[in-house]
């Protein structure tokens, strides 16, 4: 089912992100997490794609396994970096064959320590180019669904790390939507005002597709530093930093504060009519399950009944 159809039928949506594990032990842990979170009936789940396509097969295998062995609707990430048109066409054909309905099209991170890599030589310079290529694939009839793949793209409430000019940033996002994107899923943020401002600027720019908010609960002090790296410099509000500092070296307290803060974010987002919330789980279920409990719901469908 296309995500834009899900958003029409199930708003507000709740969904989860996983990343492909690289060891057998991590795989077993992830499948346990997936089993625990499947009971919460997410609208969809996404699966990340490593820098420079480094997890191409791992991502594919996880997506296909989720598709075949669970009731979940997987959405694979796909990036521009280090891919030829032939590479992307092959990846899309394999996902179409597996019955995958959606793709999240991203610019992607450059590969680390790859000698001689020149970004200018990539077939897809921007995510909008990748969106346009997927749209062309759809029009070629390569998918059992006559509409082809549903297409999502990323948004950055705190600003894109490589595009400090907010006007140009919004032009790039508009280009992705004009190329065929159905919805936007945002990078994580910790100040909801950043999201509301981003959403308002999108509407002013003529971007009217649904916008899903990305939320990642803090579960450890060290995890905060890692989050900032993953999000290319996430901004932590002073009130959150003060709450974390009061915990000192008590990691259990840090986790409780982080989950409470994320829950308050979710409640506020829901009160402000958010289209959906996407939880960055880091392949763990505890924080997400605690947020559901604090929201007073046992699964995603219960949230829609209460809305």
PLM feature spans:
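Conserved N-terminal beta1-alpha1 strand-loop-helix module at the mouth
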Residues: 1-47
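Conserved, mostly hydrophobic/aromatic
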Residues: 17, 45, 95, 176, ...
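N-terminal amphipathic alpha-helix/helix-capping segment at the start of soluble metabolic enzymes
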Residues: 1-16, 23, 139-149, 300-307
């Amino acid at each position: 089912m296309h995500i834009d159809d899900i958003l029409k039928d199930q708003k507000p949506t709740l969904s989860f992100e996983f990343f492909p594990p690289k060891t057998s032990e991590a795989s077993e842990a992830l499948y346990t997490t997936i089993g625990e979170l499947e009971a919460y009936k997410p609208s969809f789940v996404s699966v990340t794609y490593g820098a420079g396509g480094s997890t191409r097969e791992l991502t594919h295998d996880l997506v296909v396994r989720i598709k075949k062995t669970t009731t979940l609707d997987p959405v694979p990430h796909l990036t521009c970096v280090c891919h030829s048109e032939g590479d992307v066409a092959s990846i899309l054909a394999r996902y179409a064959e597996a019955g995958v309905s959606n793709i999240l099209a991203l610019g992607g991170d450059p590969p680390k320590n790859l000698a001689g890599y020149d970004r200018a030589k990539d077939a897809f310079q921007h995510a909008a180019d990748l969106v346009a290529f997927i749209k062309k694939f759809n029009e070629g009839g390569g998918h059992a669904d006559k509409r082809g793949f549903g297409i999502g793209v990323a948004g950055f409430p705190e600003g894109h790390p490589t595009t400090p000019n907010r006007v140009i940033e919004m032009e790039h996002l508009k280009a992705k939507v004009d190329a065929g994107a159905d919805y936007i899923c945002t990078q994580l943020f910790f100040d909801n005002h950043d999201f509301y401002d981003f959403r308002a600027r999108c509407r002013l720019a003529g971007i009217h597709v649904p916008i899903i908010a990305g939320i990642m609960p803090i579960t450890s002090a060290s995890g905060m530093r890692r989050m900032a790296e993953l999000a290319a410099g996430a901004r932590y509000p002073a009130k959150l930093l003060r709450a974390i500092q009061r915990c000192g070296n008590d990691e259990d307290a840090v986790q409780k504060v982080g989950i409470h803060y994320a829950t308050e974010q979710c409640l506020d987002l829901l009160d402000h009519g958010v289209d959906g919330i996407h939880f960055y789980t880091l392949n763990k279920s505890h924080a997400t399950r605690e947020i559901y409990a604090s929201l007073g719901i046992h699964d995603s469908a219960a949230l829609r009944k209460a809305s």
